[in-house]
Amino acid sequence: RDVERSRGLGDVYKRQHLHSFENHPFQVNDDEAMAELVESVKEEGILTALLVRPLGDGEYEIIAGHRRRHAAQLAGLKEVPVIIRNMDQDTAVRAMVDSNLQRPNILPSEKAFAYRMKMEAMNHQGTSGGISAKDIGKNANDSARQVYRYIRLTYLMNDLLNAVDRDVIGLQVGVELSYLTVPEQEMVEEVHESTGKYPSLEQAKKIRQHREEKTLTKEIVRLLVIGERKKKTTVTLKQDEIKKYFPPEYDEQKIRTVICQLLEEWSNQNH
């Protein structure tokens, strides 16, 4: 049978009918903690039932318990205890995020996408952004401002987001870089590949400023990251070199005006 009662934990369902939450933001890793959980499952079984919601046709979506389901698989269990709850999508998202935020050692990327999913769910349910950010932060000991910082990380390309997870890039640096377009973020990653360096917070702010001023180039990123200033070009012309091209009655102001006009015309033709 697919279903039977389980030691007061709820119903027991075959593992094959339990599916991961759609776009589940939390990783399930085969690490030391998972190995310990597998041993516990082998010795005592699953002590806390998985929370699931019905999808129809005897299939269920896991709200809480993805690590337990994976441990059961590694331990060779074909059935796991579940508690079934009917939930709409937004309620399910909120429950999924809240249950997983209790995990230890959550990566910035996991928290980022979890916060964004919960924020969107709460907004769908009519909660304003400011209130929802405060509520989300309260449950995870983060301020509303910090919640927004984490959500900004979801706009990073994978290479940069992974660098934040590895603590190679600081959280606030990631936030600054998240305002760049994908091609601009790719420039940052290409500079990292060639120099071995990511921008500091101060450098990231300057990169963002260039982006807002529409002056950002890969060379500017490189110069900022390696700490070099772009050299200014200085041209000095002697007075007699210039005056030979002008009538004797032209004073300094007239000469300056003509030179500027000629340079403007040249620039328009060559850029």
Where are the regions that the model predicts?
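Short, charged/polar connector segments at secondary-structure boundaries
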Residues: 1, 6-7, 11-85, 96-102
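Glycine-centered loop/turn motif at secondary-structure junctions
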Residues: 45, 76, 141, 167-168
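Amphipathic alpha-helical extensions and coiled-coil-like segments
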Residues: 113-120, 144-268
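Residue-level marker for well-ordered alpha-helical positions
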Residues: 35, 66, 130-131, 157-158
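Amphipathic, charge-rich alpha-helical segments that serve as recognition/docking helices
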Residues: 26-27, 70-155, 179
